[in-house]
Amino acid sequence: MVLNEKDMELLKFKENDVVVKRVKLSTGEFYAKYCNIYEAFMELLGNKVFALSGIKCPTYHYIKEAYCVISDDVRKYDTYYHPFDLNMNGYTLRNVKGKLCDSGLFSNMDEINFQIDVMHFIDILFSNIDRHISNFGFARREDGTGYLVVYDNADFLTQFDKATRPMSIDGADSLSFVFTAKEVEAREFISKLSEEEILYLLKIYEMFSPIRLVTIIRSIEKENNIKLPDKLDVFKKYLKNYLMVGKLLKERGKIHKK
């Protein structure tokens, strides 16, 4: 993307600017979000994963000189409501109150919960391995519409997932934490899971195989001229564990099929 001096000036965030702003550049109309290089990577990762998950959304671009991530020209989209309705938070997962049901993006709770677990899985694998498992919640209103709510205060969310999607494991707000469990814990957790939950986790595992995850990271680095080698280091550190959990899930899945 070629930007001129005037474009760069418009992209610069001033002290009183909101975190996300709409800007008219020489090449089109865009959304821009202020972020440092680490936050930018997580935005780009989130955007890429959304696209791979089949969610239609404008592609992000990292503008290093302006400390921001910008969208594609939004005028070329007839309708778009994601992830900009989430204020371009991608997978930084901070202070997000995204209108998912209201947008009509998902038609049922299972799909919403699947997306929540995918978000959680990517976040704990690449962002903060020690993050508490209770980061996501879904609240319904009386009229049937609802909001996905994300907070860092884990205790606040305990009520949400249990109310919308009962788990076989007591205290589990999201199944995706299984992917970071050590072998003894993983075996214990997985032995308690129902067939539905096993298939659910296998769906996530197959969507984001180790090779595919590395490919995603490298494509982000190449497309945006952004290099964060620690992301691959973190992934390699947990790769053996991730493969082990995948193997356990597949073994358990075969038992259920018999």
For every predicted segment, state its role.
Residues 69-121, 142, 183, 192:
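ATP-dependent phospho-/nucleotidyl transfer catalytic cores
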Residues 59-65, 132-141, 255-258:
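Short alpha-helical "patches" and their helix-cap loops
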Residues 1-90:
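Conserved ATP-binding subdomain of kinase catalytic cores across diverse folds
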Residues 97-162:
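Conserved kinase catalytic-core segment
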Residues 35-36, 139, 143-258:
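C-terminal catalytic region of ATP-dependent kinase domains
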